[in-house]
UniProtKB/Swiss-Prot annotation:
Binds 2 zinc ions per subunit. A motif (DEAH box) lies at residues 333-336. One of its GO terms (molecular function) is ATP hydrolysis activity. This is Replication restart protein PriA. The keyword Transport does not apply. Component of the replication restart primosome. Keywords: ATP-binding, DNA replication, DNA-binding, Helicase, Hydrolase, Isomerase, Metal-binding, Nucleotide-binding, Primosome, Zinc. It comes from Chlamydia pneumoniae (Chlamydophila pneumoniae). GO terms for cellular component: primosome complex. Residues 490-658 form the Helicase C-terminal domain.
Amino acid sequence: MGYIESSTFRLYAEVIVGSNINKVLDYGVPENLEHITKGTAVTISLRGGKKVGVIYQIKTTTQCKKILPILGLSDSEIVLPQDLLDLLFWISQYYFAPLGKTLKLFLPAISSNVIQPKQHYRVVLKQSKAKTKEILAKLEVLHPSQGAVLKILLQHASPPGLSSLMETAKVSQSPIHSLEKLGILDIVDAAQLELQEDLLTFFPPAPKDLHPEQQSAIDKIFSSLKTSQFHTHLLFGITGSGKTEIYLRATSEALKQGKSTILLVPEIALTVQTVSLFKARFGKDVGVLHHKLSDSDKSRTWRQASEGSLRILIGPRSALFCPMKNLGLIIVDEEHDPAYKQTESPPCYHARDVAVMRGKLAHATVVLGSATPSLESYTNALSGKYVLSRLSSRAAAAHPAKISLINMNLEREKSKTKILFSQPVLKKIAERLEVGEQVLIFFNRRGYHTNVSCTVCKHTLKCPHCDMVLTFHKYANVLLCHLCNSSPKDLPQSCPKCLGTMTLQYRGSGTEKIEKILQQIFPQIRTIRIDSDTTKFKGSHETLLRQFATGKADVLIGTQMIAKGMNFSAVTLAVILNGDSGLYIPDFRASEQVFQLITQVAGRSGRSHLPGEILIQSFLPDHPTIHSAMRQDYSAFYSQEITGRELCEYPPFIRLIRCIFMGKCPKQTWEEAHRVHNILKEQLESTNPLMPVTPCGHFKIKDTFRYQFLIKSAYVIPVNKKLHHALMLAKLSPKVKFMIDVDPMTTFF
């Protein structure tokens, strides 16, 4: 339907359109839709296509002589309340993102383009792993593509999606269908394989008696809930101190008052344990929302939440934008976690800070929980902006864990060679295996070897598309770029630098090699490895965690994915193999993130009646961050870190705005960044320091070169207006894109 005379309509609507547009557009309201209200999701025409938008305002006049009509209501039946509309505009202004792009956060259950739903399938092995390996040995020579499919299926703990399997194995559907005809695998509807309710109970809840500090925190939160006034509480509790029990009781109190709750967790994987605990307490009132759900599941959850039939919602950052009826409580668990920050595309929002703003707009109580609070949150608590509650002791059955620091410089001298496991660590692992207790090993690098070079000229192999060293993954026998996930089709036969015959020299280690070494030292050991290689497919993370929690393995090896919020009662030893690795990164948050990571990993040990022990290997044993982490002394760490932040004018004493410019030509990208930078020099006041243009830490990603500069300011929105003006004046080349990251988690990468 084309443009119509505006006089045809009695009512007009200002619509926020789900497109890259930073303003509302006027549309005519047909007579049959005159009942629609502010916040209603509608279908409209834009540039010849159908889009979804949300009505911002109904009015009786328009400045347009001709106008497009609203086509109809969106199938999602979503209506955004006033507080979410206000939040949408605030996010757009604060995080420097077009209204249309920001709107997509609030409508995750539907596409901005109206498309037909598609069926999703999973691929399941019909044979045992042993039998499949026999079949693989016969097939991989005669039918390499079928062999590639079976290798992927054997590698993962749960059935992958059909499209994911095709992409990972780099095959069409043909070899998969051939294997299906041979009776080796099945292709089934994903709905048949959804995680059943009874599988969620492998983390059994136990009734808890509150200790005095917990009771004090509960009293403060209950007081906020009863007054229906906005307050933000920082629940600062050491690992294992009973923060989850406080979440449960606060949620129960909110329900008694007829209020709903949103509980945010950093990653999807953590929803399994959390949902288990909450469903055991609240039953069908609990819902889950995350981006891996189907569109129909997301639409159903949003509708139930907005109608009030679903009163508790658990999920990662995307769950924050659900239109809950009578929202009274927002909980952000592990509030310090970097996963709460959106970094891939605008708006680059931080879910913790947006949660606080949503609480303010909805007159709700906000609870931020962490054993290692961000410096920003702790500073807000000390200043009185947040209500502070401390939990300084572990819950009833748990004992304080013993922590030891191992100087790897001395261990290397003793062994006269490079080692990954010190003798004290191997001894402690052997002791746990002897008595049937479990061990957790943290190593924050995946793959087998992290550096591959030419033995002749020592040239290190890098990704041709990125400024990144390639990592060798032994199981798949590939060199992989961890930035763009590309890999050479075959291992190189000649060196690109000296042109000689390529004999590869392998250095460095990842979780895959750690697992292999452990199996060589302890032949009977049962291991589970959790990293982004073993958890690519839907349900794989949950399956591996369930296997470990139910005693199917002795040792859990993993990257930072295993550091967050997991509660394994039989784990009595946590080993951090490379405690200082993050300290070498030239970033103002490096020490904070290392301290948080060590503390969180250490907190996985000794969480029940069995005493726990933590071993930290480090080549920087005298570093103050390592010492504070070893003593679990947050106050000491905060005191030393906050002094440096204030001296150098970094958060929490100032706001940072990171301006990133990206283009295929490095010279042109640098020039365009400088053009904007020079305009801002003239516009910004001396109270807003402007840092020079520099290459990003990851200078080249996917054949795109990246430059950046930083702006420091006490107030973001006024600077954003000047930045917008500078970008308009600069008239950037269409070949150079930009992204604005307000309150960045890193100023390096």
